[in-house]
Amino acid sequence: MSVGLPGPHSLPSSEEASNSGNASSMPAVFHPENYSCLQGSATEMLCTEAASPRPSSEDLPLQGSPDSSTSPKQKLSSPEADKGPEEEENKVLARKQKMRTVFSQAQLCALKDRFQKQKYLSLQQMQELSSILNLSYKQVKTWFQNQRMKCKRWQKNQWLKTSNGLIQKGSAPVEYPSIHCSYPQGYLVNASGSLSMWGSQTWTNPTWSSQTWTNPTWNNQTWTNPTWSSQAWTAQSWNGQPWNAAPLHNFGEDFLQPYIQLQQNSSASDLEVNLEATRESHAHFSTPQALELFLNYSVTPPGEI
């Protein structure tokens, strides 16, 4: 048997095989023969890298989501989009062609009659009416709702017409009593709101000017005293107080004028009797007791005596 010499690619010997168990702990030792193989493989790798240069990062394509602004949008095809706008038009026409309930003349008369009596019906009343007219509850309810809307619209139009007519005619504004001043004409109001003094204007109230303030209890009484009729009221001092007889004198003349005319028609004997009575009354009233009685009588109203 011929034993081959160990070459560069020969198998390891038995000693090397026995020591192979400790290869993990000991570093591998390469012989000079192995360096030639390693150098050859390294030169081949360098040549391949030089022949085909590695592309840079700029040359590599970006692996990510495409930009929405640059990349074209992909249209998703769906069966609904393929059908086109024709089917949408058909849907619109189907909505417009909604079934309308056709009422008979008898049903319309019954519904209108009930609407005039009662505009709002309860659930039970609608069910009873629908059973009588052979209609559904929804049909009766819808008819009443539409009728109420028509009635409200008609009332609104009528109100607008009447208001426009009044504006065009230019009707006079309504005068309210609270707008006018409740004070009389002579009572002027200053800018500050205070009431001024009475002016030169007179009180012109038609309700007062036509009325005469007459007291029936006083009209029936005649205040004529024959003892005072011919008495002359002269200025004299009673108890040291001066008495201004000018207004009383004028008042006495006006008051005694009809009585004096009556005396002129009387006889001379009657005149002498009256003069005598006047002297006696003058002498009687010249006393202080009579004067005090006269003053108390003049102050006290006739009804309280």
UniProtKB/Swiss-Prot annotation:
Start and end residues of each stretch annotated as Required for DNA-binding: 123-152
Function: Transcription regulator involved in inner cell mass and embryonic stem (ES) cells proliferation and self-renewal. Imposes pluripotency on ES cells and prevents their differentiation towards extraembryonic endoderm and trophectoderm lineages. Blocks bone morphogenetic protein-induced mesoderm differentiation of ES cells by physically interacting with SMAD1 and interfering with the recruitment of coactivators to the active SMAD transcriptional complexes. Acts as a transcriptional activator or repressor.
Species annotation: Mus musculus molossinus (Japanese house mouse)
PANTHER family, sorted: HOMEOBOX PROTEIN, HOMEOBOX PROTEIN NANOG
Region annotation (Disordered) ranges: 1-30, 46-95
Annotated segments matching region 10 X repeats starting with a Trp in each unit: 198-247
Polar residues bias locations: 65-77
PROSITE patterns for this protein: HOMEOBOX_1, HOMEOBOX_2
GO MF terms, alphabetically ordered: DNA-binding transcription factor activity; DNA-binding transcription repressor activity, RNA polymerase II-specific; RNA polymerase II cis-regulatory region sequence-specific DNA binding
InterPro entries linked to this entry: Distal-less_Homeobox_TF, HD, Homeobox_CS, Homeodomain-like_sf
Subunit structure: Interacts with SMAD1. Interacts with SALL4. Interacts with ZNF281/ZFP281. Interacts with PCGF1. Interacts with ESRRB; reciprocally modulates their transcriptional activities. Interacts with NSD2.
Subcellular location per the Swiss-Prot or TrEMBL entry: Nucleus
Family note: Belongs to the Nanog homeobox family.
Annotated spans, Sufficient for strong transactivation activity: 248-305
Matching Gene3D superfamilies: Homeodomain-like (1.10.10.60)
Name of this chain's protein: Homeobox protein NANOG
Record field: compositional bias (Low complexity): 13-25
